[in-house]
Amino acid sequence: MGTRFLLALCLVLLVLGFEVQGAQLPQQDERPSPALLSQVQESLSSYWESAKAAAQKLYEKTYLPAVDEKLRDLYSKSTAAMSTYTGIFTDQVLSVLKGEE
């Protein structure tokens, strides 16, 4: 029974080996045509432009001046605080690196 099992296993492996060899695709040496690349580029560009236009329309439709003013104020306050804390942190790092004199 061991011999039959080995013979069946060898036959299965042989068949699988031939199947794998037959499934290989030939290598294509030709490059994609420039016309195809330009078509893809043009279609992606048109999709991008339409998405930008839709986003701009949505922004204009939902624009609220009060919210815009609050966001600008929040941004200016947060950047001022960040610059202050960045300066403090930089001074601390420099004093640690420099050491005590």
Curated annotation (Swiss-Prot):
Cellular localisation: Secreted
Signal peptide: 1-22
Region ranges (Lipoprotein lipase cofactor): 78-101
Propeptide feature ranges: 23-28
GO cellular component: chylomicron; high-density lipoprotein particle; low-density lipoprotein particle; very-low-density lipoprotein particle
Keywords: Chylomicron, Glycoprotein, HDL, LDL, Lipid degradation, Lipid metabolism, Lipid transport, Secreted, Sialic acid, Signal, Transport, VLDL
GO biological process, one term: positive regulation of phospholipid catabolic process
PTM statement from Swiss-Prot or TrEMBL: Proapolipoprotein C-II is synthesized as a sialic acid containing glycoprotein which is subsequently desialylated prior to its proteolytic processing.
Start and end residues of each stretch annotated as Lipid binding: 66-74
Pfam annotation, one family: Apo-CII
GO molecular function: phospholipase activator activity; phospholipase binding
Family assignment from sequence similarity: Belongs to the apolipoprotein C2 family.
Purpose of the protein: Component of chylomicrons, very low-density lipoproteins (VLDL), low-density lipoproteins (LDL), and high-density lipoproteins (HDL) in plasma. Plays an important role in lipoprotein metabolism as an activator of lipoprotein lipase. Both proapolipoprotein C-II and apolipoprotein C-II can activate lipoprotein lipase.
Record-given protein name: Apolipoprotein C-II
Gene this protein is translated from: APOC2
